[in-house]
Amino acid sequence: MKKWIVMASLLLAALPAMSAQRLKDIANIGGVRPNQLIGYGLVVGLDGSGDKVTSSPFTGQAMINMLNQLGVQVPPGTKIDPKNVAAVTLTATLPPFSKRGQMLDVTASSIGDAKSLRGGTLLLSPLKGADGQIYAMAQGNVVVGGAGASAGGSSTQINQLSVGRIPSGATVEREVQTALGDGEFIHLELQESDFTTANRAVQAINKVFGGDTARAVDGRLIEVRAPFDSNQRVQFLSRMENIAVDPADLSPLVIINARTGSIVMNQAVTLGSCAVSHGNLSVTVNNTPQVSQPNPLSGGKTVVTNQADITINSTSGKVVGLKGGANLSQVVNALNALGATPQDLISILQAMKSAGSLKADLQII
């Protein structure tokens, strides 16, 4: 834990202070955004690693429907064993301004009990948007980055085998209209809501284009007057998105991942003076089988019982005084002095926040 905190502090300490950034790096143009697509399909050509008919009956039904659509009549009541076929969900991202014929990458994820999608081919499948309309058609060979093997009841696996990617596997068939060329104004949406940054962005835009070209609606939204002609509007946006803006100073923030024990903090975090007592309590349970063997002629039965031994170990807590830290390196040194595990450190940081010693917002994900 100490090693990783020290490495993080060195990396963050090497970063320069908050400097000017391009407007395109801190704000998005309203209405210019990607759209998520989703679909359902069948991956065929698997070498016996597909779905099982007993646990994934929908795969067999999908195969029958597909064959019927292709003109192959399947007699009613026919059971199909889809061991070489896997049912998958398809996901893709439709970028803004996508045109018909543009290719998209597709991710295929097994929804049955297929062991692997390696070597499979996705059959032609529609990709729909949130409105239920078809925006792309997907088909192609599935590329799986993992590997696995099994023999004699033992198996090993590297990375995921039930998720694959189809590079350039979908073709855009429907375009999404944007409101970029409509109206007198366009809207800039800051990625992080902040009144200071919004005010500085407005001043920087008006300094370049003059007059009242831009005005702040709130801490996130900026309204900008733009030319009506599409070509002039593109030139205008090209100039505007490269304007340098000084963002507001970062708010002190500590982010904790409770599942992995990861802790990340920014350079604005400081500590107030406090004292922390830290100790550990561990409980160990050992089960030992005990066999009761009766005499041969007694008519009794052999009985196996478990004897449980429970041991509780407690390490004495120590009180560590933490001095107030004015920069990230001092905060890291103070936390390293505790000698706590990542999970213990989460509880300590929460207690320090409640005591008012941690001068930062605490966000647990």
Swiss-Prot record:
Highest taxon in the source lineage: Bacteria
Signal peptide (residue range): 1-19
Main location: periplasm
InterPro entries, alphabetized: Flag_FlgI
UniProt-annotated location(s): Periplasm; Bacterial flagellum basal body
Assigned keywords, A-Z: Bacterial flagellum, Periplasm, Signal
GO MF annotation terms: structural molecule activity
Record-level GO cellular component terms: bacterial-type flagellum basal body, distal rod, P ring; outer membrane-bounded periplasmic space
Keyword Transmembrane included in the entry's annotation: no
GO biological process, one term: bacterial-type flagellum-dependent cell motility
Quaternary structure (record): The basal body constitutes a major portion of the flagellar organelle and consists of four rings (L,P,S, and M) mounted on a central rod.
Protein role: Assembles around the rod to form the L-ring and probably protects the motor/basal body from shearing forces during rotation.
NCBIfam families according to UniProt: PRK05303.1
Family to which the UniProt record says this protein belongs: Belongs to the FlgI family.
The name this protein goes by in its record: Flagellar P-ring protein 2
Species of provenance: Chromobacterium violaceum (strain ATCC 12472 / DSM 30191 / JCM 1249 / CCUG 213 / NBRC 12614 / NCIMB 9131 / NCTC 9757 / MK)
Lineage: Bacteria, Pseudomonadati, Pseudomonadota, Betaproteobacteria, Neisseriales
Protein's gene: flgI2
